């Protein structure tokens, strides 16, 4: 999917290789377990965002945002990728693997594997 906009009241699942320079708005969940989100943004009202990879090695601006509550998970996140849950956000400055983002005690918490890197 390239240069597109998708809006759904429930779940969005992408089975192809990736989303490039696109905007995805989902009510409950966004999944692209075997692909990349490179450029653009994914916004979920309440639920999870799951991707194999966010951003790209050149630092293309990419955003994953959950409006209310949920988790963001990715195998790989590149620099200049922003993640947010509610009003709290974090921007990656280096390539990071095994990423989990969630609210813990109301604080945005970011893990790389078992290492806490924010929160």
Task: Describe the role of every protein-language-model region.
Residues 2-119:
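Intrinsically disordered, low-complexity terminal regions
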């Amino acid at each position: 999917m390239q240069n597109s906009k998708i809006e759904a009241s429930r779940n969005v699942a992408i089975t192809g290789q990736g989303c490039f320079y696109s905007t995805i708005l989902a009510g409950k969940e966004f999944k692209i377990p075997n692909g990349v989100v490179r450029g653009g943004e994914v916004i979920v009202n309440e639920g999870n965002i799951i991707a194999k990879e966010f951003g790209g090695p050149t630092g293309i601006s990419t955003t994953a945002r959950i409006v209310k509550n949920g988790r963001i998970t990715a195998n790989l996140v590149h620099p200049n990728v922003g993640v947010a849950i509610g009003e709290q956000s974090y921007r990656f400055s280096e390539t990071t693997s095994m990423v989990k983002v969630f609210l813990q005690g109301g604080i945005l918490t970011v893990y790389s594997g078992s290492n806490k890197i924010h929160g």
